[in-house]
Amino acid sequence: MANRLAGHLDQLVSPNQSAFIKGRFILDNFMLVQHTTKFLHQQKQPRNLMKLDITKAFDSVSWPFLLEVLKYLGFGPIWRDIICGLLASSSTQILLNGSLGNKIAHRRGLRQGDPPSPMLFILVMDILCAMVKKASEEGLLQPLATRAL
């Protein structure tokens, strides 16, 4: 399933996303940020640069939202049911003093180590990027106008 999804990510996700997508390199985004900050520093004008801390975002993905994203992107009901089954079957057990506790069912988030999880996360994050872009287009955020970086 992860391999089938990976083969289509480059068509589903905007070019701004580079992690976990074949043919794209996450280092490109680091270089873009480095060049952008250098450019801003050289301009010597007050500017803001937004960085989002997504440290816990993987664990807080809303399942209903993810399923709506998949539906919006054209994933059929069978695919969505499979993903829903993967999500609903995830649980955690805590080992304390050698005893394994009861299972704790997850209600949100993506299972780390599950092959499709990074790709599903990218699909959700792409919606966030689209929202930031729309806010910029509507004048709520000011885009950075630069020459070639």
Regions flagged by a language model, labelled:
Residues M1-L149:
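Nucleotidyl polymerases of mobile genetic elements and RNA viruses
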